């Protein structure tokens, strides 16, 4: 327990209060920053249950998001043509068609499409810290492999990804550097992929019993 709470606290979602400690990204103290400011500093949260935004096309939403981030970094706004080229290339990596970009944000999307749309946003924003909150939940094997491909494409030495999951199966396609087990809101155990495999076989009881 506490995994999604941790993700939401780092991202600065309303409804949570930090009573002790600090949240830092590099040299930046995030505690008192608004969610939008944290996002501009490179924090990205892929929601467990992405919401619909009727009347706003995916392309409009994504370009506005990217433009906002570039403005905060004093970078020139991308032309519509240049952005469309980048968006279509990123969508293709996730097996999404150009027509997908014209649809309303998450409007009528399947569960798998919503999750892939979150990964699409991550690829375009290129955050320093991406938190994926149960992105694998409810996905069939094909969608899971596609999402994993997008995560692997994004991962490099200049960023960090926190994957929140209950299951080991995502790690069949993504090689983690560390596996942390949270119990009652605290990290109870840390290991590598072998730890995830052990949890899949033996459950969590042996951790709470020690």
Sequence positions of predicted segments:
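ABC ATPase NBD Q-loop/coupling interface
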Residues: 22-38, 106
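ABC-family P-loop ATPase nucleotide-binding domains
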Residues: 41, 51-128
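Conserved H-loop
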Residues: 158-166
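Conserved beta-strand-loop-alpha-helix hinge in the C-terminal portion
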Residues: 173, 182, 186-209
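Walker B motif beta-strand of ABC-family P-loop ATPases
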Residues: 128-134
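Helix-to-loop junction immediately C-terminal to a conserved catalytic motif
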Residues: 11
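Helical segment within the ABC ATPase nucleotide-binding domain
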Residues: 144-157
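Walker B catalytic motif
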Residues: 134-135, 142
């Amino acid at each position: 327990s506490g995994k999604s709470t941790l993700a939401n606290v780092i991202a600065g979602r309303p409804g949570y209060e930090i009573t002790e400690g600090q949240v830092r990204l590099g040299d930046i103290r995030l505690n008192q920053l608004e969610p939008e400011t944290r996002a501009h500093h490179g924090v990205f949260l892929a929601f467990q249950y992405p919401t619909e935004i009727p009347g706003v096309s995916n392309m409009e939403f994504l370009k506005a998001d990217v433009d906002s981030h570039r403005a905060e970094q004093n970078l020139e706004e991308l032309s519509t043509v240049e952005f469309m080229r980048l968006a279509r290339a990123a969508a293709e990596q996730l097996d999404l068609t150009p027509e997908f970009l014209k649809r309303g944000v998450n409007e009528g999307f399947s569960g798998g499409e919503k999750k892939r749309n979150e990964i699409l946003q991550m690829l375009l924003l290129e955050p320093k810290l991406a938190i994926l909150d149960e992105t694998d939940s409810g996905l069939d094997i094909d969608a899971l492999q596609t999402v994993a491909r997008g995560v692997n494409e994004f991962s490099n030495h200049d960023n960090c990804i926190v994957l929140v999951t209950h299951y080991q199966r995502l790690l069949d396609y993504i090689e983690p550097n560390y596996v942390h087990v949270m119990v009652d809101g605290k990290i109870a155990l840390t290991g590598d992929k072998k730890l995830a495999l052990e949890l899949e076989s033996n459950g969590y009881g042996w951790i709470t019993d020690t």
